[in-house]
């Protein structure tokens, strides 16, 4: 819709311009400050220029045009809105989608939590964001690949194995053991210890030479838990890349770095000169004892990713990784790639309340708020909605009790109620959507046209959400559209009115946009509300 309007305006103006959406839809659907850019050139006030330009659009078939305070305002005509509504309904649940125009557009790596414990609430924001970004990007025609990077080559895996051994000896065999704070705790450790006992027998907990075997077993069990948690919220990741499996590539990647001339040795330690590209200090990649650092593993992984030849790479990280960006981008540059192809999206912190009191999050202490805990409290729909309801650049705080309310204060309830209400009205009218598809919406009153316009801008919202990486604009749109619908419904009699079919068709478009948008954020729209 917006593109059609822009191309028509450009045909008349013949120059590039900015097209905005005024806050007041009663005033106009679109507006441009184009006249302000011409004031100096033509030595006239923007108001005079805008009024003169408006005359060029007289009797336009798509919109009425008028000027206010130097702005050109465009109000879409009923016939145009009706044709757009017909197109939307014919596309049904493909409304707003596009076919892929190319391959290997975006590679998204997200979550990538250490495989030493279940996902906690701090991981969920990146998980929901990454999955939603992939869903919506694919829907608007981009080729997207998703991956989870498994950090399974560091000391934390050894700690997992020792944690399982110590727990088994303490809890299963009633031994008095020292259990330092740095080791992992929690119900999942108990579950894994019991599984290990059944599979390997008691001896594995006492044989230090078998700690790696126990750690690998524990890692695999943790990954099963992580995959199950993700599946329960509808997140399916295409590839699971193991850090350990990439270490065969380490030597080749280090040679590539060395050939760039941006790697050097000092005190038998190997550094990359990341300060050359804005890092705070040069970073160690190989320790003096020959062991690679965590950064070295990450560089190997990014080398492997960039070899796949995607146009753009997105890493979704926690905000505490902000200082890590410069060193990774420097390494990518030194490997001969364009570092601007890597985009890092940071997730700010999440704090969770219940009955107004904060939960403490600490995976190792076994007192973390797990993703599965939240799921059991509020369900997948509320979880997915709340975690993209705010810009990722802002911290997120919410009370799970608020998300259980069945009233307008709970946004997911309010939005679902709008969708269910449309079905309710059709049932009351004893009609189906197909019965009214031929109704003409050209003569809706202003409030009806504005509601229709709001329902029809869904494709623009989706495009903007992806290109600006502002996925919170989708739940904001859903809340706004639902509020507009409820207001219109409360102010207008539908069943039995002279324009019943027109209003039912209008509601069909509203319900379609709600259904499509909810689906894209991983939520199935409710056809009826259950109390």
From Swiss-Prot:
Keywords, comma-separated and alphabetical: Aminoacyl-tRNA synthetase, ATP-binding, Cytoplasm, Ligase, Nucleotide-binding, Protein biosynthesis
Localization annotation: Cytoplasm
Record-linked InterPro entries: aa-tRNA-synth_I_CS, Arg-tRNA-ligase, Arg-tRNA-synth_N, Arg-tRNA-synth_N_sf, ArgRS_core, DALR_anticod-bd, Rossmann-like_a/b/a_fold, tRNAsynth_Ia_anticodon-bd
Pfam families: Arg_tRNA_synt_N, DALR_1, tRNA-synt_1d
Full protein name: Arginine--tRNA ligase
Signal peptide region: none
CDD domains for the chain: ArgRS_core
Span(s) of short sequence motif 'HIGH' region: 113-123
Enzyme Commission code: 6.1.1.19
A GO BP entry: arginyl-tRNA aminoacylation
SMART domains cross-referenced by the UniProt entry: Arg_tRNA_synt_N, DALR_1
This protein's encoding gene: argS
Assembly, per entry: Monomer.
GO molecular function: arginine-tRNA ligase activity; ATP binding
Catalytic activity reported: tRNA(Arg) + L-arginine + ATP = L-arginyl-tRNA(Arg) + AMP + diphosphate
Protein biosynthesis in keyword set: yes
């Amino acid at each position: 819709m917006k593109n059609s309007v822009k191309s028509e305006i450009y045909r008349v103006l013949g120059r590039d311009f900015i097209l905005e959406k005024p806050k007041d839809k009663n005033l106009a659907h679109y507006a441009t400050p184009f006249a302000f850019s011409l004031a100096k050139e033509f030595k006239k006030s923007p108001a005079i220029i805008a009024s003169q330009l408006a005359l060029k659009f007289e009797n336009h078939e798509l919109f009425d045009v008028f000027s206010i305070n130097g702005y050109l305002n465009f109000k879409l005509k009923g016939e145009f809105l009706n044709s757009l509504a017909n197109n939307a309904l014919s596309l049904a649940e493909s409304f707003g989608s596009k076919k892929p125009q190319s391959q290997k557009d975006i590679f998204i790596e997200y979550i990538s939590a250490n495989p030493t414990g279940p996902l906690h609430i701090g991981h969920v924001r990146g998980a929901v964001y990454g999955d939603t970004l992939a869903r919506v990007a694919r829907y608007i025609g981009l080729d997207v690949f998703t991956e989870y990077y498994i950090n399974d080559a560091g000391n934390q895996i050894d700690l997992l194995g020792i944690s399982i051994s110590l727990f088994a000896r303490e809890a299963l065999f009633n031994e008095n053991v020292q259990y330092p704070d740095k080791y992992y705790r929690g119900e999942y450790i108990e579950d894994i210890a019991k599984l290990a006992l059944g599979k390997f027998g008691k001896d594995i907990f006492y044989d230090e030479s078998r700690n790696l075997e126990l750690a690998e077993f524990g890692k695999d069990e943790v990954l099963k838990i992580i995959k199950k948690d993700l599946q329960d919220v509808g997140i399916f990741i295409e590839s699971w890349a193991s850090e350990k499996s990439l270490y065969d590539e380490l030597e080749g990647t280090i040679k590539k770095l060395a050939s760039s001339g941006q790697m050097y040795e000092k005190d038998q330690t190997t550094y990359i000169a990341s300060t050359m590209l804005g890092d705070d200090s040069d970073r160690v990649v190989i320790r003096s004892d020959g062991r690679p650092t965590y950064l070295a593993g990450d560089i190997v992984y990014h080398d492997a990713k960039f070899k796949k030849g995607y146009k753009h790479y997105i890493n979704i990280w926690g905000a505490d990784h902000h200082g890590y960006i410069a060193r990774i981008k420097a390494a990518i540059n030194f490997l001969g790639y364009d570092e601007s192809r890597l985009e890092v999206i940071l997730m700010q912190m999440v704090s969770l309340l219940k009955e107004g009191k904060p939960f403490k999050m600490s995976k190792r202490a076994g007192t973390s708020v797990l993703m599965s805990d939240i799921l059991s409290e509020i369900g997948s729909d509320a979880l997915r909605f709340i975690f993209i309801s705010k810009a990722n650049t802002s911290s997120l705080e919410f009370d799970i009790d608020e998300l259980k309310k069945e009233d307008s204060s709970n946004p997911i309830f309010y939005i679902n109620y709008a969708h269910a209400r449309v079905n309710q009205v059709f049932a009351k009218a004893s009609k189906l959507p197909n019965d009214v598809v031929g109704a003409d919406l050209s003569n809706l009153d202003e409030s009806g046209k504005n509601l229709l316009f709001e329902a029809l801008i869904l494709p623009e919202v989706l495009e903007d959400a992806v290109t600006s990486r502002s996925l919170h604009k989708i739940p904001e749109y859903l809340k706004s559209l639902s509020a507009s619908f409820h207001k219109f419904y409360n102010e207008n009699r539908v069943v039995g009115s002279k324009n019943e079919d027109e209003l039912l068709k209008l509601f069909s478009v509203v319900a379609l946009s709600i259904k499509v948008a909810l689906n894209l954020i991983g939520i199935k729209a409710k056809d009826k509300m259950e109390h």
